[in-house]
């Protein structure tokens, strides 16, 4: 359960951070 959340966050969070910070 937890590894799945960590894996999804690992893929999703960088994209959000990239969009917010405009550093891609």
Curated annotation (Swiss-Prot):
GO terms for biological process: defense response to bacterium. It is found in: Secreted. InterPro entries: Antimicrobial_frog_1. Disulfide bonds join 18-24. Keywords: Amphibian defense peptide, Antibiotic, Antimicrobial, Disulfide bond, Secreted. Coiled coil: none annotated. Expressed by the skin glands. The keyword Zinc-finger does not apply. One of its GO terms (cellular component) is extracellular region. It comes from the Eukaryota. Belongs to the frog skin active peptide (FSAP) family. Brevinin subfamily. Antibacterial activity against Gram-negative bacterium E.coli. This is Brevinin-1Sa. It comes from Lithobates sphenocephalus. The lineage of its organism: Eukaryota, Metazoa, Chordata, Craniata, Vertebrata.
